[in-house]
């Protein structure tokens, strides 16, 4: 009822983003028997605009989003837990059959380099092995660049100046 709209009737509104994205929102909602109807905004910018509108009006919104993004930091969005992702839950066949009923998989930072890098540039190879950038690290940077429109090099310099101990450990 809290999320219901005229278009969703007695069901809550679940804001989907671009329907061309790979997503299982409708399947997850149906398979978990949740009282929501998915309404797609049509694009990422339209979703952000809808989020801006809802937050400004102090209206609740339930939506699919991902992290790290500036919107997560700007609005301090919280994750609504779903059953944990598993390979079994989201197999190709489950997706094909509309049987997905779990959370999305976590994206992990993967670092790739030439197999010759360790030999040809051992200092670069060592740096890449030590380098880490967490979601929280990125969430601290994204709003400055994406929302406040600060130049990316200025945002990066600010992070470098404030995190000397972090990046020196990578060298």
Regions found by a protein language model. Name each.
Residues 7-9, 56-57, 73, 103-105, ...:
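Extracellular/periplasmic catalytic domains that process cell-envelope and extracellular macromolecules
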Residues 94-110, 121-123:
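Conserved, surface-exposed functional patches that form binding/active-site neighborhoods
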Residues 120-131:
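Short amphipathic alpha-helical coupling segments at ligand-binding clamshell hinges
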Residues 1-15:
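A conserved helix-loop-strand patch within extracytoplasmic ligand-binding domains
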Residues 12-93:
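Ligand-binding pocket segment of bilobal, Venus flytrap-like solute-binding proteins
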Residues 2-5, 27-37, 46, 54-60, ...:
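Metal- and O2-centered redox machinery and metal/ROS homeostasis
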Residues 131-171:
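C-terminal functional modules
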């Amino acid at each position: 009822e809290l999320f219901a709209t005229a278009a969703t009737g007695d069901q809550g509104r679940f804001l989907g983003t671009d329907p061309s994205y790979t997503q299982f929102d409708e399947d997850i909602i149906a398979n978990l028997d949740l009282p929501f109807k998915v309404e797609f905004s049509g694009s990422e910018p339209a979703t952000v605009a809808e989020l801006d509108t809802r937050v400004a009006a102090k209206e609740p919104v339930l939506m699919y989003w991902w992290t790290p993004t500036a919107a997560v930091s700007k609005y301090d969005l919280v994750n609504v837990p779903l059953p944990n992702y598993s390979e079994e839950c989201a197999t190709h066949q489950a997706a094909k059959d509309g049987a997905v009923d779990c959370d999305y998989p976590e994206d992990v930072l993967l670092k790739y380099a030439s197999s010759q890098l360790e030999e040809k540039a051992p200092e670069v190879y060592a740096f890449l092995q030590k380098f880490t950038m967490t979601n929280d690290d990125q969430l601290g940077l994204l709003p400055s660049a994406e929302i406040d429109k600060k130049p990316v090099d200025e945002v990066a310099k600010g992070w470098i100046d404030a995190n000397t101990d972090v990046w020196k450990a990578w060298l």
